[in-house]
Regions:
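Short, conserved catalytic-motif segment at the N-terminal edge
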Residues: 31-90, 110-114, 119-120, 125-127, ...
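Short, well-ordered beta-strand elements
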Residues: 347, 358-361, 365-374, 512-513
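N-terminal secretory signal peptides and thylakoid transit peptides that target proteins
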Residues: 1-17
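Boundary at the C-terminal end of the N-terminal hydrophobic targeting segment
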Residues: 23-28
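Peripheral terminal and inter-domain segments
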Residues: 312, 321, 343, 383-535
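Short, surface-exposed loop or secondary-structure junction motifs
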Residues: 75-76, 129-353
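Short loop/turn microsegments at loop-to-beta-strand junctions
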Residues: 53-55, 333, 356-358, 499
Length: 535
């Protein structure tokens, strides 16, 4: 946990650096060279990892878009190529749009960054009344609330029926697992609350503001703020390796497209094309002003959004496998900030089922790169997210492809070992302590809602089924595993399975806890945060 004093020290250090750090160094103008280098590198990456279905890549150099291109196919085995107009889900890269929207409202005098959230959302409540009172609009964006990693994400993922109001109402039941403003833990639910602040101030939903005040002025005509608005636009299909034995291993598989992420739009709803996202990068690098002179926000707001707020990580610096590893990393307002080979880089990643994306901006060069993929291929993503900025700097001296292959091989070996360990019953696969019918019933968690366990079949064919009442995708068989621990087998095999550990007292089931089966499960499957009580 990072103490408040250390955070204050970090902000003080950045304040001392001040404008000098944001002033542009004198780099030689070489517009076009980085775009060509990234294009060549992307082709090398695609050749090195032939299972990667497709990519969309955009490069801005000295304020000009020099590359906006698609690579590969929209669907593995299909004929449709990825082009500069193909839409990808950019997930948490959306957070910078939400921060920019709030910055615009700050400039209009409709709110202040350090106003309490309750001023605009009177019903806003965290589980700690002190945190409720102190939580500001700025805090909503900084991942320093004290919530644990991904807390409450089952209210937004995968495709549940919770409304935005449900999500905000559920916050008061999420335990504060850390120190308020004293540490970093990434969340999504507070960005949903930030979107509701925008709606409360403007009288229109978050997506309407984003469309009218950002996408339309930038002429981002391909892009949509919510997946449900894609319609018949060309889009990439999501892919992942679904095992065996666990997700992340096995052959590449096409996943069903999730178009129902609307409730969490402010946290990750945007779908964008390579040619559109370059316009967003330009206005960011222009500190609120486009190359054509259209001003969306002031330079002061642009700098405010890039100002470090929360320490997120620190290390001993570069390693043999990662020569760009930063010694210190921070979160700003919708962006991460650290250095890349001695230059400030402002960046973010995004992940949805079957999609990974990355935005990296080098303000000193007024240059940046956006990488959008339609698969969960970590070595492809790692090669491009680090090798891309290298090429913006005119470098190609490190073999990111070889390094990423090595890191991936080591990761897969560990994953196989960890998965085998997770799937080995500690009690030797003992039978349940009670008849299966005793586990049936409705279980309720205060922030998520109800989970139903039911009996199917009769006699020797009796089995259990499980259904998350507000998440249609999370339903299927509940198989015996080890005593009172069962394992889900969801009908939708693109979902992460979970262990369900029932609590038994005096011969009766009283409740249950859960945890993901795969060691590589996305943190948004926050089963471990559920405290299910049988009702």
């Amino acid at each position: 946990m990072i103490a408040t004093t250390r955070r204050a020290a970090l902000l003080s250090a950045f304040a001392t650096i001040g404008a000098a750090a944001l002033a542009r160094p004198a780099f030689a103008r070489q517009t076009g060279k980085a775009g060509a280098a990234v294009d060549q590198f992307a082709q090398e990456v695609m050749a090195a990892f032939p299972d990667e279905p497709g990519l969309g890549i955009t490069v801005v150099e000295d304020g000009e878009i020099t590359l906006a291109k698609g690579y590969g196919v929209r669907r593995l085995g299909g004929p449709d190529r990825v082009t500069d107009s193909t839409l990808f889900g950019v997930a948490s890269n959306t957070k910078a749009f939400t921060a920019a929207a709030l910055a615009m409202l700050v400039e209009e005098g409709k709110l202040a960054w350090d106003d309490p959230v309750t001023k605009y959302l009177p019903a806003f409540e965290m589980s700690d009344p002190i945190v409720t009172r102190l939580m500001t609009v700025r805090d909503l964006l900084c991942h320093r609330s004290g919530l644990t990693l991904g807390a409450g994400d089952l209210m937004i993922w995968p495709n549940p029926t919770h409304t935005r109001a449900d999500i905000v109402a559920g916050l008061k039941y999420l335990p504060i697992g850390g120190q308020f403003r004293g540490g970093y833990a990434y969340d999504n639910v507070l960005y949903v609350a930030a979107g509701e602040v925008i709606a409360a101030l403007t009288g229109a939903p978050w997506e309407v503001f984003i469309q009218k005040r950002i996408l339309d002025p930038l002429k981002m005509t391909d892009s949509v703020p919510l997946p449900s608005l894609i319609g018949n636009r060309p889009r990439a299909e999501p892919h992942a390796r679904m095992g065996p034995p666990v997700r992340g291993l096995g052959p590449q598989t096409v996943l069903p497209f999730d178009g129902s992420f609307d409730s969490a739009g402010a946290a990750g709803g945007l779908n964008a094309s390579p040619r559109d996202i370059g316009k967003w990068m330009q206005v960011q690098l222009g500190l609120g002003t486009t190359p054509g002179g259209v001003k969306l926000w002031t330079e002061a707001s642009g700098r405010e959004m890039w100002k470090p707020q929360t320490i997120t990580a620190w290390s001993d610096g570069p390693t043999a496998d990662n020569p760009v590893r930063a010694s210190l990393q921070a979160y700003a307002l919708g962006w991460f900030v650290n250095d890349h080979r001695g230059e400030k880089i402002v960046w973010h990643t995004g992940g949805l089922a079957g999609f990974i994306s990355y935005t990296g901006l080098l303000p000193g060069r007024k240059s940046g790169i956006m990488v959008m993929t339609n698969a969960e291929e970590t070595p492809v993503f790692r090669s491009l997210r680090y090798g891309g900025p290298d090429r913006l700097q005119g470098r190609s001296d490190f073999d990111w492809i070889a390094s990423s292959k090595k890191v991936q091989a080591e990761s897969e070996a560990k994953l196989v070992k960890d998965a085998a360990e997770a799937m080995t019953p500690k009690g030797g696969g003992a039978p349940p302590t009670l008849p299966l019918a005793a586990y049936a019933g409705t279980y309720r968690d205060p922030w998520y809602g109800a989970v139903t366990v039911s009996v199917a079949g009769k006699g020797k064919k009796t089995s259990l089924k499980i259904a998350f009442d507000k998440t249609p995708a999370l339903k299927g068989a509940l198989e015996t595993f080890d005593g009172d621990t069962f394992k889900t087998r969801f009908d939708d095999r693109s979902q992460e399975d979970a262990f369900v550990v029932f609590s038994v007292k005096d011969g009766a089931v009283t409740g249950a806890t859960m945890r993901a089966v795969s060691p590589l499960a996305d943190f948004s499957y926050d089963y471990q945060d559920l405290k299910l009580v049988k009702i």
